[in-house]
Amino acid sequence: MFSAAISVFVLATLTAATPMARGIIPAPPAGQCNVGTQQCCNSVQDASSDPAAGLLALLGINVQDVTGQVGLTCNPITVIGGVNSNCDASPVCCENNSFGSLISLGCVPVSL
């Protein structure tokens, strides 16, 4: 009886003392975005690059206000097996796609 009580106590102590990672956010699974939507962009560039900066200026957007990369001529990636389910160019997750398919802001690469 005494050994069973000791075993329960030791097991509870070991369980409570097991180190756990705190504050670490796991990466999203391949093909998923933490924020924004998946896009297939013909080109992904830094906001300060000439083509991206030119389009941003035409839209009245300050280059310094853009975080992440800029996707040019992007289309949404839909469910697997759909018409737009694959991407032969640059698959990215973008935060701001409110400019049609011309430009997407805040893009990060994603694996499909």
Swiss-Prot record:
Q: Which GO MF term does the entry hold, naming one?
A: structural constituent of cell wall
Glycosylated residues are: N96
Q: Which InterPro entries match?
A: Hydrophobin
State its location(s): Secreted; Secreted, Cell wall
Q: Which Pfam families has this protein been placed in? A: Hydrophobin
Q: Which domain of life is it from?
A: Eukaryota
- Signal peptide positions on this chain: 1-17
Kindly list the cysteine pairs connected by disulfide bridges: C33-C93, C40-C87, C41-C74, C94-C107
Description of what induces expression: A CT-rich motif, which is often found immediately upstream of the transcription start point of highly expressed filamentous fungal genes, is present at the expected position. Two additional CT-rich regions are also found upstream of the TATA box in the promoter region.
**GO cellular component assignments:** extracellular region; fungal-type cell wall
Transmembrane regions: none
Keyword Disulfide bond listed: yes
Q: Supply the alphabetized keyword list.
A: Cell wall, Disulfide bond, Glycoprotein, Secreted, Signal
Whether Repressor counts among this entry's keywords is no
Q: What's this chain's function?
A: Aerial growth, conidiation, and dispersal of filamentous fungi in the environment rely upon a capability of their secreting small amphipathic proteins called hydrophobins (HPBs) with low sequence identity. Class I can self-assemble into an outermost layer of rodlet bundles on aerial cell surfaces, conferring cellular hydrophobicity that supports fungal growth, development and dispersal; whereas Class II form highly ordered films at water-air interfaces through intermolecular interactions but contribute nothing to the rodlet structure.
Q: How does it assemble?
A: Self-assembles to form functional amyloid fibrils called rodlets. Self-assembly into fibrillar rodlets occurs spontaneously at hydrophobic:hydrophilic interfaces and the rodlets further associate laterally to form amphipathic monolayers.
Provide the family line. Answer: Belongs to the fungal hydrophobin family.
- What is the protein name for this chain? Class I hydrophobin 5
Organism phylogeny = Eukaryota, Fungi, Dikarya, Basidiomycota, Agaricomycotina
